[in-house]
Amino acid sequence: MQQPFLPADFTLASSTALVGPYGSGKSEIALTLACLMARRLQARPDNRLQVALGDIDVLKPYFRAREAGEALKAMGVRLLAPGGSLKSADLPILTPELGCAAREADTLLVLDVGGDPAGARALGSLRDEVDTNALDLLLVLNRHRPFMESVESVVEQADKIQRASGLRLTGVVSNTHMMAETTLDDVALGLELARRVGGALDVPVRLIGLGRAIATLIERDDLAPSLLQGIPAIVLDSALKPAFLGGCALSPGAP
């Protein structure tokens, strides 16, 4: 997968956790970021880092990162999630490897966190393992999801997540979309809300999520300078959605 809107020097903190309500797209973003970083690191001859993706989305067992386990392994991403009979469990199960990975200096850890305050408590249980000074806690925002349509409602959800996890948000990810029906207006309105939410929380907009079709349109018509406003954007290919919902297979050639 080409990433035309992501600078070549784009990188992640030692630990990056993505939080937000169900349907915001955090699992897709977590998976894509992990694969992207693994690919970029593997291209460096002096690289000593590895990438791990921790799936602690313990609530709704839909579109979770663990569903792409075999493909992630082939792409050099270490998946940390319950396996075997517990793979589909809708239970607050955290693997011991998560705590170990959080302490490893040679590991970039990406965390896919549950979609509401109850799920954020799972992240809170790792608080003593993670260097909070090197943790990015990013709120993924899709304006078209319930309770995400106004600054006040988003900030209320954000405050609940912060209290539940015992951690402070460090940024916002704008990922407003309508799947295949996403328009340029959706991207613009989503970014506008994300900026206002960021202002209310005193954190920056760190990233924009774009579906493949809308990203192609933006690149073709050279709309990035005006639409994305200098904010890095990551192209998402719906690797976690089943084919009947427009998903695609994750392969070692992507992203």
What does each model-found stretch correspond to?
Residues 29, 33:
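Hydrophobic positions on the alpha1 helix immediately C-terminal to the Walker A/P-loop
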Residues 36-90, 97:
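N-terminal phosphate/diphosphate-binding loop that engages ATP/GTP or pyrophosphate donors
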Residues 82-87, 106-122:
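Switch II (G3) loop of P-loop NTPases
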Residues 18:
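Hydrophobic anchor at the beta1->P-loop junction of P-loop NTPases
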Residues 117-228:
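Conserved catalytic-core segment of NTP-binding enzymes
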Residues 26:
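Conserved lysine of the Walker
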Residues 22:
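The conserved Walker
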Residues 6-13:
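Phosphate-binding P-loop
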